[in-house]
């Protein structure tokens, strides 16, 4: 069941759903608008010959902090990681789905590549996977609305929510745009093959 604005407010007011910083004006009829933070991760295209998900390529990205009052310029064909200004803490019975804002999509900005699902129990800033598919550069301003988070009531609370020790939740508590930790999905047995 998709939460309505009134159910989103109830969940926040009860302390069930955590959003920090919270602005009540961000609540939409069936979602919460999310804003862009000032941190971006850019890819170091000359450091590696290719991306290998099996390897920990620490120097694949560099963190860039945009100065107050300045935008980040995303050029055509570029892909960067960014993050929401807001930190979200989802209870064990709510899951989220991040979508872009239609006004930005109409300009050629894609907000996420594939990772729009937010598990119950997640706590942290949501990493955004931004792509410019337009023919012109797009300026990205810290604090601008960049997406919307829809929340779904689950049929029952998750038995093993995100962040549980047994899951190996790699992105729990993340702050800022967090690079891939996909290499942790490969076991040491696979590494010896």
From Swiss-Prot:
Record-marked site positions (Important for bifunctional activity): 116-117
Comp. bias intervals (Polar residues): 167-177
SUPFAM superfamilies for the chain: dUTPase-like
Region (Disordered): 160-193
GO molecular function annotations of the record: dCTP deaminase (dUMP-forming) activity; dCTP deaminase activity; nucleotide binding
Source species, domain of life: Bacteria
Pathway: Pyrimidine metabolism; dUMP biosynthesis; dUMP from dCTP: step 1/1
Single biological process term from Gene Ontology: nucleobase-containing small molecule interconversion
EC number(s) per entry: 3.5.4.30
Residues annotated as binding dCTP: 101-106, 119, 127-129, 148, 162, 174
One Pfam assignment: DCD
The entry's keywords: Hydrolase, Nucleotide metabolism, Nucleotide-binding
Task performed by this protein: Bifunctional enzyme that catalyzes both the deamination of dCTP to dUTP and the hydrolysis of dUTP to dUMP without releasing the toxic dUTP intermediate.
Family: Belongs to the dCTP deaminase family.
Matching HAMAP family: dCTP_deaminase
Record protein name field: dCTP deaminase, dUMP-forming
């Amino acid at each position: 069941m998709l939460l309505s604005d009134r159910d989103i407010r109830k969940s926040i007011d009860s302390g069930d759903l955590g959003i920090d910083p919270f602005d009540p004006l961000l609540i939409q009829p069936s979602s919460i608008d999310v804003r862009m933070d000032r941190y971006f991760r850019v890819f170091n295209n000359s450091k590696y010959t290719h991306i290998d998900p099996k390897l920990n390529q620490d120097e694949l990205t560099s963190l860039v902090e945009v100065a107050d009052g300045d935008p980040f310029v995303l050029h055509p064909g570029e892909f960067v990681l960014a993050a929401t200004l807001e930190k979200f803490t989802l209870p064990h019975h709510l899951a989220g789905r991040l979508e872009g804002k239609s006004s930005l999509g109409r300009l050629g900005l894609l907000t996420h590549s594939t990772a729009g699902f937010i598990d119950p129990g997640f706590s942290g800033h949501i990493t955004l996977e931004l792509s410019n598919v337009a023919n012109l550069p797009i300026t990205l301003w810290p604090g601008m609305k960049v997406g919307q988070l829809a929340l779904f009531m689950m049929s029952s609370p998750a038995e093993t929510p995100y962040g549980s020790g047994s899951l190996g939740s790699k992105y729990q508590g993340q702050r800022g745009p967090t690079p891939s930790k996909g290499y942790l999905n490969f076991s040491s047995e696979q590494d010896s093959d």
